[in-house]
Design a protein with these regions (language model features):
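Bacterial N-terminal signal peptides that target proteins for export
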Residues: 1-8
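Ubiquitin-like/PB1-type beta-grasp interaction modules and other compact soluble beta-rich domains
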Residues: 2, 17-124
């Protein structure tokens, strides 16, 4: 009887150990690849490839990779400087997502799959 109780105890402990490891495996966050290119003629040329949390917005991902200066607007944060290079006068930071100019700001671009983002200083 004591032998059966010991075996039962070991099986029970093993089951709880296995269940704990399964729970941790399910809680790991998924990531996607972000390829980021920042260009401004002869002022800055930065390229980086990084894994970021799936579902994060592009603004948060960019901010984690490079120093970003912003102006708060009613539409969300407007990027004013990247890596210390400021858009002044008639220039702005144009946002391209997977090769196409974005119709929304970086705050509204959600990274659900591997994404290529280019921020290029352009004239109005």
């Amino acid at each position: 009887m004591k032998l059966n109780l010991k075996i039962f105890s070991l099986l029970l402990i093993g089951l709880f150990s296995l269940q704990s490891s399964i729970s941790y495996a399910d809680e790991t966050s998924e990531t996607v690849q972000l390829s980021l290119v920042i260009t401004a003629s002869d002022k800055i040329n930065l390229t980086t490839v990084s894994r970021v949390e799936k579902g994060i917005n592009a603004y948060k991902a960019i901010k984690a990779l490079v120093v970003v200066g912003v102006k708060d607007t009613s539409y969300g944060p407007q990027i004013m400087s990247l890596g210390g290079v400021e858009a002044v006068g008639n220039t702005y930071w144009a946002l391209y997502v997977n090769g196409a100019m974005s119709m929304v700001g970086a705050h509204d671009v959600i990274l659900l799959e591997d994404t290529f983002i280019r921020l290029n200083m352009e004239d109005f």
